[in-house]
């Protein structure tokens, strides 16, 4: 998230830079920048997962065209899990009070949040590879069910990871 935070900070208008010199106002600007960086990060993750969701839908069309209708429902479960994750991460409120309202941020919590954020990008790559495997397995009716289950499992993991990140952000994480 540091990369996103620095990007937001560098795009700050001159008025905000000047106002950040006013005592107390700098904390406000800092919170706003963190909120903006968090939103930018979540939008980026959502776009990457949306690409995979579209691939999932396209694979369903290919299954129907190839007469593999019996696998479409399983693939739909994977698509629904992906869509659930995309909707959660893209529609979450901009900034959370537990993370953004305090001027001083707990480094341990921030590190945990960064780890979850990195996990989202890793999960996106894993989903892409799993969908590659589904696509490669379209001709192998024995391997296809396991490949689809893997996509569903990874999509479910993305939703669970988002929920755990939210717990850390709002202060309910253990």
Feature-to-residue mapping (PLM):
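Charged linear interaction tracts used for macromolecular binding and regulation
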Residues: 54-147
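Preference for long, well-ordered alpha-helical segments
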Residues: 137-174
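Leu/Val/Ala/Ile-rich N-terminal alpha-helices, chiefly Sec-type signal peptides and the beginnings
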Residues: 1-60
């Amino acid at each position: 998230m540091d990369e996103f935070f620095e990007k937001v900070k560098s795009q700050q208008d001159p008025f905000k830079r000047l106002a950040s010199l006013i005592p107390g106002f700098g904390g406000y600007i800092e919170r706003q920048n963190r909120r903006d960086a968090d939103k930018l990060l979540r939008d980026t993750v959502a776009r990457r997962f949306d690409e995979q969701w579209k691939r999932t839908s396209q694979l369903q069309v290919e299954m129907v065209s190839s007469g593999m209708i019996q696998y479409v429902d399983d693939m739909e479960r994977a698509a629904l899990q992906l869509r659930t994750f995309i909707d959660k991460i893209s529609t979450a409120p901009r900034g959370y009070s537990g993370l953004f309202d305090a001027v001083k941020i707990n480094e341990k919590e921030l590190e945990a949040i960064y780890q979850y954020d990195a996990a989202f990008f890793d999960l996106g790559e894993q989903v892409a590879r799993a969908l590659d495997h589904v696509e490669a397995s379209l001709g192998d009716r024995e391997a296809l069910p396991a490949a689809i289950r893997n996509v569903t499992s990874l999509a479910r993991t993305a939703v669970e990871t988002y929920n755990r990140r939210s717990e850390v952000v709002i202060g309910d994480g253990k």
